[in-house]
A protein has these predicted regions:
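Membrane-interface helix/loop caps of multi-pass membrane proteins
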Residues: 4-292
């Protein structure tokens, strides 16, 4: 019980609300794309939170003698696959009865979901996330889980490298390395973008979206020092006001952002990821998380 209570204390108050807010954005985008054309940006918050949690959880496990690569993979599989398989089966069952023509020929797609490469599968299929077609896959939104699974696959090696860097140099060096990954990942989308080409490659690509996971990691790495620094220098009302302003801007983006506009891929997506990371950090510093 004591360890469970300690794990709960590691969570930021309001984190579940942020996750729900991100999911709501994506759902609203799919249900009412005309009213919420920017709801797809909710994926950024989802990925930032995942990067944050995976770093914090791994550090906690390491400090308590519970971290091992095999154990990490086992925990991820237990967390991901049961609900994922149930969802896949439930959706297919509903479609088989209500829309059998849509349910047909989904074997390759389901395999890509279970195998963790659905984003690459969708790129190869030229499956535009922003197209509104009657035959659009009901599993289109699962591309983000594929990026998470790929990140988890390489996580033990990345975590090991960061620990070695910290041990032989400093925590500052480890943070700098992650910040470099954030910047390179964020710039990648702008570099690859071509105005005359379909944006699906950029939207689904692991190389163009993984920066959000690195952002979450970076926030987890600097969180303790930032809290100590900011709380001594800024009044609580000011911190909460910044948090509220960030949430307002994020909400506004759900209403006005357009997924196929050039500005999204020329820094807009990256800027939104940074906004998500700052909101997460501000909630951990201030008290607004208690209200969410």
């Amino acid at each position: 019980r004591k360890m469970k209570e300690q794990k709960k204390k590691r969570r930021i108050e309001g984190m579940d609300a942020l996750r729900g807010f991100a999911i709501l954005g994506v759902v609203l985008y799919h249900v009412m794309p005309g009213r919420f054309p920017g709801g797809f940006l909710g994926v950024n918050m989802f990925l930032v939170l995942s990067g944050y949690l995976i770093y914090k959880t791994s550090v906690w496990d390491l400090e308590h003698g519970e971290y091992a690569a095999g154990r990490f993979y086992k925990k991820r599989c237990i967390r991901i696959y049961p609900p994922l398989l149930i969802m896949i089966a439930a959706v297919w069952g509903i479609l088989a009865v209500s829309m059998p023509e849509v349910a047909k020929g989904r074997g390759g797609e389901v395999l890509s979901i279970v195998g963790g490469y659905n984003n690459f599968w969708q790129i190869r299929q030229n499956a535009s996330y922003f197209a509104r077609m009657s035959q659009q896959s009901p599993y289109t939104h699962l591309w983000a889980i594929a990026i998470e699974m790929q990140f988890y696959l390489m996580w033990p090696l990345l975590f090991w490298l960061l620990r070695k860097l910290k041990k032989h140099t400093s925590m500052t060096a480890a943070r700098t390395a992650v910040l470099v990954l954030v910047i390179l990942g964020g710039l990648r989308m702008s570099i690859v973008y071509r105005p005359t080409e379909d944006v699906s490659r950029l939207y689904y690509g692991t190389d163009t979206r993984i920066y959000a996971l690195f952002l979450g990691m970076f926030i987890a790495m600097i969180q303790k020092d930032v809290i100590s620094f900011v709380q001594r220098r800024l009044p609580l009302w000011f911190i909460n006001s910044l948090t509220a302003a960030g949430l307002v801007v994020m909400t506004g983006a759900y209403f006005i952002a357009e997924g196929q506009m050039p500005y999204i891929y020329q820094g807009g997506m990256f800027a939104d990821g940074i906004l998500c990371a700052l909101i997460l950090l501000l909630i951990s510093v201030g008290s607004m998380g208690k209200w969410l």
